[in-house]
Structures are given as structure tokens and as C-alpha cells.
Amino acid sequence: MPEQERKVTAKEASRKILSKLALPTRPWGQSMKQSFAFDNVGYEGGLDSTCFILQLTTGVVSILGMTCHSCVKSIEDRISSLKGIVSIKVSLEQGSATVKYVPSVLNLQQICLQIEDMGFEASAAEGKAASWPSRSSPAQEAVVKLRVEGMTCQSCVSSIEGKIRKLQGVVRVKVSLSNQEAVITYQPYLIQPEDLRDHICDMGFEAAIKNRTAPLRLGPIDINKLESTNLKRAAVPPIQNSNHLETPGHQQNHLATLPLRIDGMHCKSCVLNIEGNIGQLPGVQNIHVSLENKTAQVQYDSSCITPLFLQTAIEALPPGYFKVSLPDGLEKESGSSSVPSLGSSQRQQEPGPCRTAVLTITGIPRDSSVQPMEDMLSQMKGVQQIDISLAEGTGAVLYDPSVVSSDELRTAVEDMGFEVSVNPENITTNRVSSGNSVPQAVGDSPGSVQNMASDTRGLLTHQGPGYLSDSPPSPGGTASQKCFVQIKGMTCASCVSNIERSLQRHAGILSVLVALMSGKAEVKYDPEVIQSPRIAQLIEDLGFEAAIMEDNTVSEGDIELIITGMTCASCVHNIESKLTRTNGITYASVALATSKAHVKFDPEIIGPRDIIKVIEEIGFHASLAHRNPNAHHLDHKTEIKQWKKSFLCSLVFGIPVMGLMIYMLIPSSKPHETMVLDHNIIPGLSVLNLIFFILCTFVQFLGGWYFYVQAYKSLRHKSANMDVLIVLATTIAYAYSLVILVVAIAEKAEKSPVTFFDTPPMLFVFIALGRWLEHVAKSKTSEALAKLMSLQATEATVVTLGEDNLILREEQVPMELVQRGDIIKVVPGGKFPVDGKVLEGNTMADESLITGEAMPVTKKPGSIVIAGSINAHGSVLIKATHVGNDTTLAQIVKLVEEAQMSKAPIQQLADRFSGYFVPFIIIISTLTLVVWIIIGFVDFGIVQKYFPSPSKHISQTEVIIRFAFQTSITVLCIACPCSLGLATPTAVMVGTGVAAQNGVLIKGGKPLEMAHKIKTVMFDKTGTITHGVPRVMRFLLLVDVATLSLRKVLAVVGTAEASSEHPLGVAVTKYCKEELGTETLGYSTDFQAVPGCGISCKVSNVESILAHRGPTAHPIGVGNPPIGEGTGPQTFSVLIGNREWMRRNGLTISSDISDAMTDHEMKGQTAILVAIDGVLCGMIAIADAVKPEAALASITLKSMGVDVALITGDNRKTARAIATQVGINKVFAEVLPSHKVAKVQELQNKGKKVAMVGDGVNDSPALAQADVGIAIGTGTDVAIDAADVVLIRNDLLDVVASIHLSKRTVRRIRVNLVLALIYNMVGIPIAAGVFMPIGIVLQPWMGSAAASSVSVVLSSLQLKCYRKPDLERYEAQAHGRMKPLSASQVSVHVGMDDRRRDSPRATPWDQVSYVSQVSLSSLTSDRLSRHGGMAEDGGDKWSLLLSDRDEEQCI
């Protein structure tokens, strides 16, 4: 067909189809070459390149053997993937398949063969084929993007384009040299992406598939004819093309936004289907579909497309069940090109009205910040946006009046200490639209509300720090992107909240999720508004180090499922194909034999429960395959069992051998020949040798079997260790002894020869014992990890919420099936199953596993919760943010594992020595053999002199060989490794026994040998330096004793606090009972506890307590109370709490009382007030007291040349206060478990040996990483198992004792080795016959290992005389040096910051700020500063694991 005729035909066809679809046409004269549907992939598309004639054929295949729809699905999936197949439809009822295919690529017979390969019978049905010419269209095309590496110039680009363009099925190809990629449009029934990739690889380049676009399918709408029109080319140019002739203003005149209601969508695939297909229609500029709202926003050119056309196109999309509703006023219009304007389209989406209130605020200091006020208001329900101007003293609040009122907003601000008034004339009604407009109050000042509008462009309303914004981007924008940022410098959850809250205020940030332990932030953002480098800069502006991570892929989920109901291979194929087509699943493999499926997925898109649901929807049953939780841990049960068996077997037969050896050493007045055991049973065989032979044989082949196995493995790797030396010595000794004994019996010798049967039992007994104990110690590793994992909850209560957060359904879900984004209910006393954020409810959480602090932390909506922590009080709903291996607890487990794996074993000195000793002895033995043979043949008289022939029938040569061999074997046996092998284990066994007697449990020889090298000891604070529980330090009576006695106050306060579960309340109750000398208290009613403030109740029946006078001392400075006060029963109204609690109840706190509280708070103590019957009558100072021996231990370690440091998760000021009392100069405060590990590694990298002393779960990674981990005996099981040394008596002076004992033990080991070496150095030359000329020859007793072994054992037993230095000795050594340090003498490092935080002089404002920071065990005080910004900043840096700002923990 001529080119001109072809264009005319296309034009006429396009006009016909457009007239049917009410699509307005435009003159061809305005046309110019533009691209359609492919502009977004980087190349132009034109009519000439998209349409060509193609011959298609439809055939019918008869199929026998199909039994279910799974078979139908398998056949359709298999055949549709073949080249040349356009479509296939299989009918189970008719037993046939209708296939549309390209006959030039394959025929019907080949299709039948493919079906038969699947196990079915297939044949072509006659007379049912039809063929017709077809034009290629986008409905039959797909796009793939390939990564091409190796291109260097434009010639490479031309070569690839030229070759790929010639391939059958390739429609277009565009190669980019700068991007190193190729974008190819192809026909999937003719060629596949893998073929395209292979063709490029064959040309010498490296190619990989990046992504592919699904074929475009629009059902009855003829996209090919739509493409044939040039209306889009003429009227609606793509936004990316800057060369278009129309001006931007002209183009905007035709753009409109249409809101549509779409029913029938059920998953993300529907969204992608609509967006992908409709977005490529002529005139459609942009489309955004919301699955949650069931709406779509379409931006289109009203001059070339109509709303009716869009409705028809969407409803025609497969599978054909979409139902589109046009806005009011448009349903009845047909063919009209007029569409609602942007503003009118937005009004269709408007929800209920919102209001903007302008507040006038007075009392804000100029040097303060409005951030705390904004945070407080943003957390109120119904508040949508806040903008407060510090300069003008005004604030604009956008709120929903149906949820919150303006009076409530005013009251909330007034509660912060400011004066507020609401301007009624400025309260205006607004509607929150889905467009780009921002609500604005009438009459607002430019400095307030307009700033709010600018801060919220892009419709990013501020939802508060606890809100996770997962909403899609605005309709007018592009798809959101995600970046991952590595953040350094975070020390607590307050830092996390600070980063999340600050980033969410910026335009373009859609959601922020920060992980504290991994130091990583996941940020979703709108790339048109903000870019990832700017996000990193925003984080750095907050004072952290931030860097964009190159690998932006999220951690991939991996599960194994058990699937039942599969019967054949087609079932497997059906499941795999269904899973791989599911969005979010990256890999699926199903095994029919094992009925298991291995699935990898993106946890952000899909979860395990969703995957199981997908499988069950296609008719199968799936469940999670439970894996052994401890499968990855080292299991030493087998090794322990085998070495225990080896030791016991060697011991049973070795004890008699040792007895016989001692018997041989007993001096006797008679010659040895006359001894009973020396008598021959038969000629050449004595009683002693017979017993030795029997016992040694059992030991050699039963007890020594595992030594042979280890020696074989060592020799196979071409190395010689202690096992090789032991096996070599015992085997040669046994074989030599057996041979000479048999020879003596054969020759009927009068005297039984000297044998070495005593060597193997001695060696095997002690070495097997050492190996057994070694593997028992190693097994503790897996126990520590198992106990760590046991902290995790096994199930989670996942709930489904309805309107107003009403719980519609609860479901108990195994932890493995909990997904990110799940809403989880946690009841009081339960464990938080995952990391998350509180959605609803208030509670207190015990987070000691991460902070080490025993004080519970207040949790409210928006607060971060940690997996494994315990919910102490209220029931809460949380949203899961980190699950599986991303939780904080999993990160701690990972830290412990890495520390244990990286901790190189300390090689025994004897093992190192044996590597040289073994070959040396073999060489000496061989030289001895050769030298004596040479000497014998040169001068036989020398041999005959020292080795008289037992028989005259033996030849001269035989005598020489026997003598030379005997001396050679004697050298091997006298060089006994027994003494070397016993040198270390005997000293270690005695040393550990002595340590246990002195209250120190040392796990094996490695920590005992290493402790003497320690140069730095790092102490944890809570529970290690301190007792770990709060104690009352001072009880100050604020009223006259005559008015209210101390005993009465103690009785009332003790009774009130007896109803409290808070640790501070328990401490107060305990103190009151001790002071009153009683265990019974009065009664309390109307008890109320307000988290973060205090308690209130009514107390009665305390008269009986006052009548009882216990023998107890009163606090210093308080006189004896008067007797006989009040005879009748009284009821007291009691308030106990912080300053704010007293203010709320109308009590005034004088400056003297406030100063007294501040003095205690400056010391790291918590001060609370007591009011009885409306009168402020007492102040209680509570603190976690320092252990009395802590300062002495610190001074003693320093005197030994050991550096001492304090490392704690508590805030810097509490840590500094403790350090000054103990005498520690260097402090690391506000550190995480990972920081503790990093600090230990940092010191180890400097060549120092580090000991870590701790007691909590959060210390366990550092305990495992340290060269010697020392745990407090009263600490957690996890810490005890992870440590190398346990202080049973909870005495810090035992740290000094363990180092002292280690030095003694190592010194004894060295003495033992010297004794063993001396024995060998003297014995080997004698055994070799070097001193024969001077008459020194090998005597029988020297063949026994007892000479060296006994000396080594006796040397080790001298350790039993060790005595631990007593307290008086330590105090005498530290006399005159136990002085508290000043604050300036203590250097504090915060988190991973190596910069010293010196102690500045306290200004009046610092004292005020300090009150709101310092606390007991990460508790903060109650003084609410009116200078909100500075208090907030301080809280972010100093508070630990608090939600958004400093929160006070009170009784």
C-alpha cells in the first residue's frame, strides 16, 4: 500500500471510532511528530513504527485428562508463555482450548505437543481454524528496560539498536549511552525479554533485565485506532517535551481535573491496571487512583477527551467489573467536552467542614520556642494543622469542630502556663480538599496563617509525631519515592521522635520511620517537592550525622510454608505462578515431594498472612513451617557427650594405672625384683606388665578414640597440634611396649622388660577432662542466646479497627506472621511483641532490656515501644513498625552473636608450643636411631657394653638395630607431652575452684588466663555501681513536729504508697515500714494514680501504727515526736507527687521547698512532695544508691594500673553525679547496647584488653564482646550466660580479686611449663644415650610420666593456698585517696560522641532546665518550664526512651 493511501485510511478509521466514543477531533493541519505512550521511556513513537500487518490464526485443540480448574490454569499459563501465542482460552466443560497464534512462528501441532508434555492428551480439532490480517497494537505489546554495560561510544549504541531492531517481534528500541540502558518495545508472543538480553550479550556487552511493563489491554476499546489519530500529537503534548510550539499558558487553558468514583477495585493490582492503561490514553496527562477512597483524580486535556470517554475506557478494562461514577451534573451529559474546573472538581471530594481558630497568646519569652506548644496541640484529636508565630504572639489552628472545640484548644494552651484568648471573628469554616489548596482563615496575619499555608503545601497536614503517614501522594504529583538514611548520634527514643517529628513538618515528606538500634531511617517523599540529599541535610541540621544509603532495598522477607492439598505438578505450577504474579513477592518455589513452599517477599508490600491467604484462595491450605528457633546457635551437646564418655572411660582404667605408678615409686628395702608385681607369670611377662597391658588397651582404644579422630582431621589439613602429639606418643608407647613384651615372651626372657604402658592412661584422663569442661563452657553461648530469644512474645493479638478505633475483631497470631502495619493489642502484664508506636491508650512500660534502668517509662499515643519490654499498667493499641529481624530485641541478639563469633579463642600456650615440639621430637628420635646404628656398625663394643645381649643366638646386626630402636622409642616416650598437657588444665581447675570458694565463678581457663592482661574495666551503672532499686535518701518534714509528727506522716505516706505499684512507691513504703518498725499499715480508699504526676487517696486506721513504738532510729535532724496525739480514728486526704501535681490540686510551693528539691535533683535524685489534708508537709528524696564498696573498687583498680570507666544508658547528669561519688573520671552516658559494643571494640582496636562489668540484658552484647565479661550474680540470666566471670556475692571488690587470682594462676601455669620443659630437656638427652660414656643411662623409673606429671600437679595444688585480700587491706592501700571527685574532674561523653562534655558552671536558667532533665534511672522531674523550646531541646538530648518530650515518672 502506498504511504499516502495508508495515512488516509488511518485518518478515516480514526474519525469513525472517535465519533463513537464522543472524542472531539482536531484538524490534521496542527499535527507534528510527537510520541504516544512511550515518551516516558525516553524515545519517540510514531505511526509508521507502531502499525504493521500481521497474520494471525485461531485454532481449537481438544484436550483429554483435565480434572479441575488447576489443570485449566496450568495449561493457560504454560501455553501463553510460548512465542507466537497471542491468546488462549481453555474450557474444562468442553475439554478444548481456543488458541490465537502467529502461524509463521509455530503451528497447531506444536501447541498440541506442548500440552501433551504436561501430561494431557491433545489433538487439533478439524475445520475450526480461521486466519485474518491483524495490525500490531499496544494491546499486543510490552516494554522492557535492560541495563547494558560495556558501551563506550555512539557506535556501540548504533550497533545494538541496529541488531535488536531486526529481530522478529521487536517494535521499537532506544539505547541510552549516558544511562547505560536500553528500552525495548516488543511483542511478547514473538520474543521474550530473556531473548533480547541474550542477543545483546552475544554482541559482547553485559545486559540485565531491570524492569518490564505489562502489556496494555483495554478490551473493546480499539487502542490501535486511537493511536492512529494524531490528536494528542497536535493538542496534548507530553509535559517532558520542551520543544512544543504551544505556550504553557495555552496548554493550561485546556487542562482540567476530573474526580471519579470507581467501584470494583479490590487490590493494588487494580490500581496499577487503571493507572497504567488510562494514563496512556490520548489527552490524559496524569491519573492517580486511591484504593482506600475508591476514587481517581484524572488530569486531562478537555480539548481532546471527555469525561464520558474516560468512564467508558475504565469500565472496559479487564476483568470488566469496574464501575465508574461521574460527578453530579456530568452523568446526563453525553459527548460534551465541558468538564468541571479544578475548583469544582475539588469540591466534589470535600469532607465535612473544618475551622481555623486564631489564638492570641501572651507570656511567651522571646528567647523561647513554640515547638512544645505545637507538639502538644498536634497530638489532640481533631487538630489538623498548627502554626504559631513567636514574634506576633498569635497562632492559627485548623481543627474539626465535631471532635474538638476552640475552648478546649484554649484550655490546653493555658495548661502550659500561658494566657490565651480566641478571636471569635477570625474563626472561619474551611474544607480540607484533596487538591493543592490550603485552608486559610479570614483576616489572619501574614506572619501566622500564611506561614501555615506555605508550610503545608502539597497537602501534608501535620498529624503529630506519632502518626505514620502512609497516604499516597497528591493527585497532581508524581509517585512517591523512598530513601534510606544512615543516622549516627541517636542515643534514645527521644532522638527518634525528634527526627520523625521534625521531618514530617517539611513539605514533600510523606512518612518517616526511624529505627534506633540499626541507626536507619526510612523516608517516603514526593520527588517533585524535595530530594533525598535535602532530607539528609535536614537531619544533619538537627545535630545528627546523616548519609543516604546507596542500597535502598528493604530487607527481604523469607518464609517457608507447608502446603496441603497438592496432587500433581500442575498444582505446583498453579501455586508458583499465582505467587509470582502477586505484588510484593519476589521469589516462590514449591516442592511437591515435601509439600513445602519457599517464598521471598517485600515486607512493606505484603506479609506472611497475606501470602497464606493467596494460597488458600486458590483451593489449598497453607501454614507456617515452624523452624527451630535455636537452629542457628552452636550446639555442643554431641561434643560434651563424647568427651564425657572419653573421660569417664579413661578414668575408670586410668586410676589403677596411677595407683601402680605410685606403688612403683615407693622405696623398698628389698630389690624391685623381689616385689610381688615383678614376679613373672610366664617367662618374659610380669604381673605388673600384664595389668598395665590390660588397662592400657581399654584406655587406648576406648578412651582415646576421639583423640585419634581429632588427630586425623589435623593431619588431613597438614597441621600438627596437641592431639597429634598425644596420639603419636601414646600409639608409639603402646606399640613399642607390646612389641618388646611379645619378644620377651618369645625369647623366654628371665626378666620382663620395662614398658611404657602407663603413658596413655595418664594422658587421656587429664586431657579428656579438659576437653569436656571446655565444651561445657562453650555450650553456655547458645544458652545465653536462647534466653535472649525467650524474652520475645510468642503470639500477638492483632485487632481489626472500625470507626472511632472500635475493635471489631481480635485474632491471636504467631509472631512469625505479624506484619508491618498490624494493629496489636497489648494487655497489662503482657510483652510488647514488636517495635511499634502507641495508637491508643496510656501505660507504663518496663524497658530495662534496652536501657538497663528499672524505672518504668510512660507511654502515650505516639510513644515508641520496644519488642520484649513489659506493659506494666494500661491496655494499649500499637501499630507495628519493625517486625522480625528488625526489632530492637533481634538487634540485641544479633549483637551478642556477632560478638561471640568475632571473639577469637585464646590459644593455649601448650598448644602453640606443641606445633614446634612435635616435629622437633620426631627429628631427634630419628637422628638417635640413625646415629646409634652407625655407631654400632663402627664399634660394636660400645653397643655391647651398654646393651648386653639377652641371648647368645641373636646376631650382631640384630643387637645393633634393637638397641638403636629402643633409644629412639625412649626419646619419643620420655618427651612425654603429658606434663605439657597437664600444665594448664590442672592450674585452671585448681584456680577456678579457689575462685568459686571466694565468691567468683570463672567459666573455664580462657577468662582466667586473660584477666591478668586487663588494662581497662568498664562498669555499667544501674545494678552494678548502684543497687539497681530506688531507696529513700532523705525524708524532710516541712511542718512543725507539734502540729504533725514524723511518725504520723510516715504512717500516712506508707499506707498511701502501699497501693502503688510504681518502684518509687515501693521504695517509700519499704522505708516507712522500716522506720515504723512494723509490717502492717492502715487502709487507703479512693486511690488514684496519674502517670507522670502522682497519686491521691484517703488514708485511715493509722492509729494502731502510731500506738506501736518500734525500736527504730529517726532521721537526722528530727526530734522525737510527742506521744499520745489523736485518740479517735481519723481520715486523711493525701497527695504525693511532683510540683505539677501539687499545683493542679491548688497547692503553692515556696521557693525554699523548690530549692531544696533542686539540690537533690542536682545530685541525681528524685524529689517528691507530700500533702496531707491540703497542707504541704513533707519532701522525700529517692535515689538509686551507690554500693558502699564501689569507690574502693575503683580506687584499687586504678592503683593496679587499670583504667576505669562508667558506661550507662542513663542521662549525662545522673551519670556524672554517680561518677563523682565513685571516683571515676571517664563517663559514657546515654549509650545504647550497640554503643557499648562499639566502645569495647574501639578500646580493643587500640590494643587494650577490656573487661566489661554489667548485669542487664542491654549489657549482654558488650559482655560477650569484651575480652573478659563480668556479670553481677543478681543480674539477668542473659547477662550471666553471656559473661565469662560471675560475681556470686554481688561484691565489686571481687572484680579486683578475679584479676589478682588470674595473675597468680598464670604465674603458676608458667611454673608448670618450666617444670615440664626441664624434665624434657634433661630426659631427652639421657634417653638418646648422650651421657652413656659417663655412666648416666636411662633407668626404668625414668620411663614413667609420673616424674614430670606429679611435679606439675603438686605445683598446681599450691594455688589452694591462695587467700583473697581482705577489706582492711584494700582500705589500707586506698587510704587517703578515697575522696569524691568534683564535677570538673569528670569527663562525660554522650552516645558515640568522642568529644568531652565538660561541666559548665550552672547558671540560674541551667538550674531550672536541669530540674526537668535529671532523674533517677532516666526519670525526669516535674518542673514544667514555660520556656518550652529549651526544655524540649534538652529533653531530646537527655531523656532516655521517652516519647516526645521529657515526661516525669512519679509514684
Curated annotation (Swiss-Prot):
Chain sites annotated for binding Cu(+) 3: 267, 270
Transmembrane regions listed in the UniProt entry: 647-668, 691-710, 718-738, 758-778, 913-935, 966-987, 1311-1328, 1340-1357
Active site: 1020 (4-aspartylphosphate intermediate)
GO biological process, one term: lactation
Extracellular side: 669-690, 739-757, 936-965, 1329-1339
Chain spans, region Disordered: 328-353
Domain of life of the source: Eukaryota
Tissue expression summary: Expressed in brain, liver, kidney, spleen and stomach. In brain, detected in neuronal cells of the hippocampal formation, olfactory bulbs, cerebellum, cerebral cortex and nuclei in the brainstem. Isoform PINA is expressed during night in adult pineal gland (pinealocytes) and retina. Isoform PINA is not detected in other tissue.
Single GO term (MF): copper ion transmembrane transporter activity
CDD domains: HMA (cd00371), P-type_ATPase_Cu-like (cd02094)
Top EC class, one word: translocase
Binding site for Cu(+) 1: 68, 71
Chain residues that bind Mg(2+): 1255, 1259
Positions that bind Cu(+) 2: 153, 156
Keywords: ATP-binding, Biological rhythms, Copper, Copper transport, Endosome, Golgi apparatus, Ion transport, Magnesium, Membrane, Metal-binding, Nucleotide-binding, Phosphoprotein, Repeat, Translocase, Transmembrane, Transmembrane helix, Transport
UniProt disease link: Deficiency of Atp7b expression is the cause of the Long-Evans Cinnamon (LEC) phenotype, inherited in an autosomal recessive manner, characterized by excessive hepatic copper accumulation, defective holoceruloplasmin biosynthesis, impaired biliary copper excretion and the development of necrotizing hepatitis by 4 months of age.
Record's subunit section: Monomer. Interacts with COMMD1/MURR1. Interacts with DCTN4, in a copper-dependent manner. Interacts with ATOX1. Interacts (via C-terminus) with ZBTB16/PLZF.
Entry text on domains: Each HMA domain can bind a copper ion, they are tightly packed and closely interact with each other. Wild-type ATP7B can usually be loaded with an average 5.5 copper atoms per molecule.
UniProt similarity note: Belongs to the cation transport ATPase (P-type) (TC 3.A.3) family. Type IB subfamily.
Role this protein plays: Copper ion transmembrane transporter involved in the export of copper out of the cells, such as the efflux of hepatic copper into the bile.
Protein name listed in UniProt: Copper-transporting ATPase 2
